[in-house]
UniProtKB/Swiss-Prot annotation:
Protein name (database record): Glutamate receptor ionotropic, NMDA 3B
Lineage: Eukaryota, Metazoa, Chordata, Craniata, Vertebrata
CDD domains found in the cross-reference section: PBP1_iGluR_NMDA_NR3 (cd06377), PBP2_iGluR_NMDA_Nr3 (cd13720)
Annotated localization: Cell membrane; Postsynaptic cell membrane
Region (Disordered): 883-912
Length: 1003
């Protein structure tokens, strides 16, 4: 066979030489014919249009500069056909012009690859082939002039991954199951060299007849033996397509661990009909064709740069290649030197780390995922990531060890999951267990206080034996515990619960995750159930279910009782209301006075003509008495209109006073202040003043958000943060408070506000950073999809709403019904303004008294001496009396003494003394009733001023005339009454006559 291939290649080379001599290439290659200040790298383009366009786009990028002012020129050449003769002619034409140091090719079939390797070795010119894995085949001894870069995963790399898995599981006896492999013996040899151990069985399925019977019969050799053992530990399936691999795995007998060696994408992984625990490889981040071409060009450029620095004469004068006269260039030729530098070049390219292994294989960085077929708690198959392989290093996922190993077929045992939680009200509460260490209500959970996996395993083992100390036993209950119990019931699994050791949600510290995230990554728990916020950083390392609770971040502050200012008693009513009330009072008093004086029945001289008058001052006194509800003696209006207006004013005052009284207690007792924050963008948070402190919970989602969004704010609040939410609330409510504001999940803050007995807490500002709570699981856990599905069902059925109503239906502050014994007390500081007002009233009373004396001694005499402003009865009865009567008693006595002269000059006659007393009585009576007369009558001429003056005789005559006139009127009235009684038959007519006869006799 090898001889036939050699003859075929020789014939192709001969045809190429003949064609070169006779007529040359039918189309010009476009390669420059002379060398200049540049070296050339030729590229034989692929035949497929899409691949050709991608290669041209990659070659269009600027080429790197070389030392000594050299430049690398890229020349693209397209060959019309891909037969061996045309390929040989095209390659010879590419290499013929001077300056071409290497070429890049894209073989699409194995014969092309063999021809390129033969031509590279024959012409001693480096040829770099970018190929797919399907083109690869053992080509005999490698040559340094033909370098191969596998765009897809090379077979050697896949075998390295499989060997790493075999060694990690300590599998000794291995069986190779081959589907369609062109050189099975070469593959077995390659496996033996990589694994350092030959496989125990090699099953070639390519020679089998079509049908499942023959396939099952062949694979039965790997099944379980009669004694219960298996002939091999693992079976590796190679060279199979996705459909063929599915057929083989469906027919595989139970027993060995199956490994699928063909890399598959995640979406192509089947789930049904496969044996549990089968391992599958999946390449992630496969390099693109453009990246592979770019790295090949950079490989040549770096090798040329190194060669130009060490051997500039060879880099500046590359020799031309003549396919008609092939001569060995010797060890010092440019091609051999470049090949040597190519095999010793390595760098970090677009595909990752690039290096040449074995002088002909160009390796790039590869990354594989290892997937395993597991079973979820419902028993359904699901793929889970158990490890990853990169650059020869196999790493198992941290949570892979925690995943449940598939139970044997036919078992019905309920799986048992380990759940980690964190105490956060109202989602998770804890209380002490009973005397027996059990929980009548809630779920038994451990509080180990450590994150050590061995310690946890030992405690749960001791829990089954009943030997765990009671101090570590707790009873967990709450929102999330109810949700977990419902999930366990619907998904048919059991769980064991423990509280996270460090009490943290989880953050990246010194390259390691802490808290709940750390427990999931370390495999200590299958899931984390609490108020676990979903954020981008956590989602990169663990999986989350769909959120079962939506929330955001909020700010909580504390209210403070402050001393009421002096004018606090006026707060129940707005200043405009106060002005309106007193304006209405004076206006009502004015209308009461007008209605009373214009009414024929009013308490005025023209109305009822009594001893009292309803003036404006009386109306003001009445309106103030009604407004403040004081019971004092006051004049009331007598006219119906005035009475109606007075009652209407009383209704107005009742409503105003009731509103004032109702609001007074709320305003005075509820006088509280708090930090007004508009939200996370408030200047108080971004530029805090001296003494303003705020914080959050360490390693929580709130801290992660603030740290990523506002680094300066996080630097200030870091030293004021708390380990837990209750601790932060305690810092906020302490006396004196250690925090002015506390930032955390709004759902947690709302609960703390609702249970605050003193009503000192409240949330302020706009919510921000909308987030949700989900159940955390290891990456690619088979539980994620099932849990998310059931959570969605709970939302639709209303179960989530029932949980919210159960744990969040608290009575908020301001709407609570206080106990009978609980009273709202107001101290002196609440009504300090009233005391100040009373003191001001006492001071103003002194000023009023001073004003009275000023009016009495200065203003009143001036008005009395004038002729105007003598009628004040409608305004004030007191002022009117003072103006329209004689001098006061003291002044009158002094005036009488002045008029009478010395005592010894006045005779003390009894008649004169008696007459003086009568005169004084008349004067006093006149002073009491004189205001009832008209102004003209009241101001009549009374000539007497002194009792002993010259006007006594005139006064006596006037009095006698008045008495006589009165007697005449009385006599006429009595006569008329007698006539009327005579008509009625009354015999009492003589009585008035005696009165009339007695009157003249007395006179």
């Amino acid at each position: 066979m090898e001889c036939v291939q050699t003859l075929w290649l020789s014939l192709a080379l001969a045809l190429a030489r003949g064609s070169w001599v006779v007529r040359g290439h039918p189309q010009p290659c476009g390669v420059p014919t002379r060398a200049g200040a540049s070296v050339r790298l030729a590229a034989l383009l692929p035949r497929a249009p899409a691949a050709r366009a991608r290669v041209l786009a990659a070659l269009a990028t600027p080429s790197p500069r070389l030392p000594h002012n050299l430049s690398l020129e890229l020349v693209a050449v397209a060959s019309p056909t891909r037969d061996p003769a045309s390929l040989a002619r095209g390659l010879c034409q590419v290499l013929a012009p001077p300056g071409v140091v290497a070429s890049i090719t894209f073989p699409e079939a194995r014969p092309e690859l063999r021809l390129l390797q033969f031509l590279a070795a024959a012409t001693e010119t480096p040829v770099l082939s970018v190929l797919r894995r399907e083109v690869r085949a053992p080509l005999g001894a490698p040559t340094p002039f033909h370098l191969q870069l596998d765009w897809a995963s090379p077979l050697e790399t896949i075998l390295d991954v499989l060997v790493s898995l075999v060694r990690a599981h300590a599998w000794e006896d291995i069986a190779l199951v081959l589907c369609r492999v062109r050189d099975p013996s070469g593959l077995v040899t390659l496996w033996t060299s990589r694994a350092s151990q030959a496989p125990k069985f090699v099953l070639d399925l390519s020679q089998l007849d079509s049908g499942n019977d023959s396939l099952r019969a062949t694979l039965a050799l790997l099944g379980t033996l009669e004694g219960g053992g298996t002939p091999v530990s693992a079976a590796v399936l190679l060279g199979c397509s996705t459909a063929h691999a599915h057929e083989v795995l469906e027919a595989a007998p139970p027993g060995p661990q199956w490994l699928l060696g063909t890399p598959l994408p995640a979406e192509a992984l089947p789930k049904t009909g496969l044996p549990p625990g089968v391992l599958v490889l999946g390449e992630t981040g496969q390099p693109s064709l453009e990246a592979a071409v770019h790295d090949m060009v950079e490989l040549v450029a770096r090798a040329l740069s190194s060669m130009a620095l060490m051997h500039p004469e060879r880099a500046l004068l590359p020799a031309a290649v003549n396919c008609e006269d092939l001569k060995t260039g010797g060890s010092e030729s440019t091609a051999r030197t470049l090949a040597r530098f190519l095999s010793n070049t390595s760098f970090q390219g677009r595909t990752g780390a690039v290096w040449v292994a074995g002088s002909s294989q160009v390796h790039v960085s590869r990354h594989f995922k290892v997937w395993s077929l597991r079973r979820d708690p419902l028993g359904a198959p699901a793929w889970a990531t158990v490890g990853s392989w990169q650059d020869g290093q196999l790493d198992f996922q941290p949570g892979a060890a925690a995943l449940r190993v598939p139970s044997p077929s036919g078992t019905q045992a309920r799986p048992k999951l380990r759940v980690v939680t964190l105490v956060e009200h109202p989602f998770v509460f804890t209380r002490e267990s009973d005397e027996d260490g059990q929980c009548p209500a809630g779920q038994l959970c451990l509080d180990p206080g450590t994150n050590d996996s061995a310690r946890l395993d030992a405690l749960f083992t001791a829990l089954e034996n009943g030997s765990v100390p009671r101090t570590l036993r707790r009873c967990c209950y709450g929102y999330c515990i109810d949700l977990l119990e419902r999930l366990a019931e619907d998904l048919a699994f059991d769980f064991e619960l423990y509280i996270v050791g460090d009490g943290k949600y989880g953050a990246l510290r010194d390259g390691r995750w802490t808290g709940l995230v750390g427990d999931l990554l370390a495999g200590r728990a299958h899931m984390a159930v609490t108020s676990f916020s979903i954020n981008s950083a956590r989602s990169q390392v663990v999986d989350f279910t769909s959120p079962f609770f939506s929330t955001s971040l909020g700010i909580m502050v504390r209210t403070r009782d402050t001393a009421s200012p002096i004018g606090a008693f006026m707060w129940p009513l707005h200043w405009s209301m106060w002005v309106g009330v007193f304006a209405a009072l004076h206006l009502t008093a004015l209308f009461l006075t007008l209605y009373e004086w214009r009414s024929p029945y009013g308490l005025t001289p023209r109305g009822r003509n009594r001893g009292t008058v309803f003036s404006y001052s009386s109306a003001l006194n009445l309106c103030y008495a009604i407004l403040f509800g004081r019971t004092v003696s006051s004049k009331t209006p007598k006219c119906p209109t005035g009475r109606f207006l007075m009652n209407l004013w009383a209704i107005f005052c009742l409503l105003v006073l009731s509103s004032y009284t109702a609001n007074l207690a709320a305003v005075m007792v509820g006088d509280k202040t708090f930090e007004e924050l508009s939200g996370i963008h408030d200047p108080k948070l971004h530029h805090p003043s001296q003494g303003f402190r705020f914080g959050t919970v360490w390693e929580s989602s709130a801290e992660a958000y603030i740290k990523a969004s506002f680094p300066e704010m996080h630097a200030h609040m870091r030293r004021h943060s708390a380990p837990t939410t209750p601790h932060g609330v305690a810092m906020l409510t302490s006396d004196p408070p250690k925090l002015n504001a506390f930032i955390m999940d709004k759902s947690l803050l709302d609960y703390e506000v609702s249970i605050d007995a003193d009503c000192k807490l409240l949330t302020v500002g706009k919510p921000f950073a909308i987030e949700g709570y989900g159940i955390g699981l290891p990456q690619n856990s088979p539980l994620t999809s099932n849990l998310s599905e059931f959570i969605s069902r709970y939302k639709s059925s209303g179960f989530i709403d029932l949980l919210h109503d159960k744990w969040y239906k608290m009575v908020p502050c301001g709407k609570r019904v206080f106990a009978v014994t609980e009273t709202l007390q107001m101290g002196v500081y609440h009504l300090s303004g009233l005391f100040v007002l009373l003191c001001l009233g006492l001071g103003s009373a002194l000023l009023t008294s001073l004003g009275e004396h000023v009016f009495y001694r200065l203003v009143l005499p001036r008005i009395r001496r004038g002729n105007k402003l003598q009628y004040w009865l409608h305004t004030s009865q007191k002022i009117h009396r003072a103006l329209n009567t004689g001098p006061p008693e003291g002044q009158q006595e002094r005036a009488e003494q002045e008029c009478s002269g010395p005592k010894e000059e006045q005779p003390a006659a009894d008649g004169a003394g008696r007459w003086r007393r009568v005169r004084r009585a008349v004067v006093e009576r006149e002073r009491r009733v004189r205001f009832l007369l008209e102004p003209g009558e009241a101001g009549g001429d009374h000539p007497w001023l002194c009792s002993n003056g010259p006007g006594v005789q005139a006064e006596l005559r006037e009095l006698e005339l008045r008495i006589e006139a009165a007697r005449e009127r009385l006599r006429s009235a009595l006569l008329r009454r007698g006539e009327l009684r005579a008509q009625l038959g009354d015999g009492t007519r003589l009585r008035p006559l005696r009165l009339l006869h007695a009157a003249p006799a007395e006179s």
